[in-house]
């Protein structure tokens, strides 16, 4: 008997016994993802109050009930995110090993963004309580309770960060002095590299359908980060080519040959040339650099495709990751439409990324 979701298993019955109930709940959640008809109706709205009324007929229900008028886009984003967090916690609180650890890995990406926010705010002497309010709720951690004792980055490192689940990444990659001296985006990418490699190895350890689905998803995420790091580094004097290459995750379709070439690239045209030999990235990169559709949009579209395909599979944990990411894209779509309505830019309203 081989590995199945990290267990010595006897087939789908073992998966169904431990994780089948939660997968069924998740697939029920998935049915509530907005349809193309829902998006068409949202795009017909004249104001945000109309959007509020339309949401009542969707899975979002009356999630904006009680919100005073006029409703703001930030309120819609906050409440939609709150719904996603509630669903995530519902699954996580009932999960057993190894699904519980897999769900924790999902939260670590948001935790990294929160840590970077706290470091940035501390360096600029921002109010700590204000920083916590801006943290993503999926990336909260217990040692945030000790933030009241933080007065500088040394306090943050020694009293907070080393007690987070990210401690192995932080202690393995960053020193206390780095927080004060290193560019904040280098810190973010250093932590994310360690996180992606760890998550990828964990999915390989789980094996089975989890490894199969998550391998494609995480390899794409690694490639996206490598491409973005390269493009964003052009003109950045504090980042040498050698330092840039150290930030690339050690996985992906581009790794190692493509990332080695990216490390030597001088401009966007050279990046485009490097990616020409990779059919996955060739077209949407050329579509997205100087045209109306941004490179970021092309990345989001491919991410949606990979996560949507995860639901064609069964008996693995990929759907749990995919659902969170699809809902996240849905929230971006909702916010985009709401912003277009608020700013009277209805001609751009249809530039959202459909999911199903």
UniProtKB/Swiss-Prot annotation:
SUPFAM superfamilies: V-type ATP synthase subunit C. GO terms for molecular function: proton-transporting ATPase activity, rotational mechanism. The keyword Ion transport applies. Keywords: Hydrogen ion transport, Ion transport, Transport. Disulfide bonds: none annotated. One of its GO terms (biological process) is vacuolar acidification. It comes from the Eukaryota. One of its GO terms (cellular component) is endocytic vesicle. InterPro entries: ATPase_csu/dsu_sf, ATPase_V0-cplx_csu/dsu, ATPase_V0-cplx_dsu, V-type_ATPase_csu/dsu, V-type_ATPase_csu/dsu_dom_3. Signal peptide: none annotated. V-ATPase is a heteromultimeric enzyme composed of a peripheral catalytic V1 complex (components A to H) attached to an integral membrane V0 proton pore complex (components: a, c, c', c'' and d). Belongs to the V-ATPase V0D/AC39 subunit family. PANTHER family: VACUOLAR ATP SYNTHASE SUBUNIT AC39. Subunit of the integral membrane V0 complex of vacuolar ATPase. Vacuolar ATPase is responsible for acidifying a variety of intracellular compartments in eukaryotic cells, thus providing most of the energy required for transport processes in the vacuolar system. This is V-type proton ATPase subunit d. It comes from Dictyostelium discoideum.
